[in-house]
Amino acid sequence: MASRGVNKVILVGNLGQDPEVRYMPNGGAVANITLATSESWRDKATGEMKEQTEWHRVVLFGKLAEVASEYLRKGSQVYIEGQLRTRKWTDQSGQDRYTTEVVVNVGGTMQMLGGRQGGGAPAGGNIGGGQPQGGWGQPQQPQGGNQFSGGAQSRPQQSAPAAPSNEPPMDFDDDIPF
């Protein structure tokens, strides 16, 4: 089976400004946000703490764009899953320009994190094709967070019933000999 590659971006960061929303001729919403992610480390030579911030352009489409425009504000913390896209455009002087963005389409996810800052969505709102939570390799969803996925219809979360175990419960009250 031939591999086509993987193009997936996961970001957790804070908005640098309020979302910019516009509408396409077909009525679909498009929201542009800038997301800051920061990394901290201690400089081995000086012992001083250093920090580097990266700014990411993120484009949300459809219902996700509408949700972002209504609930996200400058400083909001958000979890994003999308794809990298580079697009070409021509500036006013006729020069070709390129920009790389994280595009969040139907298969992507936007989840608001943190508390309700100045009135956010009610806790537990879930729109679209959210995936079951938990398991290895999947992001842990904070309690009370609001997850919005790009699916067109709302699906209830389904959890698998716990498999019965034949093992006795673990007893942690034993004395440890060391």
From Swiss-Prot:
Region described as Disordered: spans on this chain: 113-178
Annotated phenotype, changing G5D: Increased frequency of precise excision of transposon Tn10 derivatives (mutant SSB-200)
Record comment: activity regulation: The C-terminal tail exerts an inhibitory effect on ssDNA binding.
MF GO annotations: enzyme activator activity; identical protein binding; single-stranded DNA binding
Mutagenesis or variant effect for L11F: Increased frequency of precise excision of transposon Tn10 derivatives (mutant SSB-202)
GO annotation, cellular component aspect: cytosol; nucleoid; replisome; single-stranded DNA-binding protein complex
DNA-binding annotation, residue ranges on this chain: 55-61
Effect of H56L: Reduces DNA-binding affinity
Ranges annotated as biased composition (Gly residues): 115-137
Keywords: DNA damage, DNA recombination, DNA repair, DNA replication, DNA-binding, Phosphoprotein
Biased composition range(s): Low complexity: 138-165
Annotated phenotype, changing P25S: Increased frequency of precise excision of transposon Tn10 derivatives (mutant SSB-202)
Record's comment on post-translational modification: Phosphorylated on tyrosine residue(s).
Pfam family, any one: SSB
Quaternary structure and partners: Homotetramer. Interacts, via its C-terminus, with many proteins involved in DNA metabolism such as DnaG, HolC, PriA, PriB, PriC, RecO, RecQ and SbcB. Interacts with RadD.
PANTHER family attached to this UniProt entry: SINGLE-STRANDED DNA-BINDING PROTEIN
Name assigned to this protein: Single-stranded DNA-binding protein
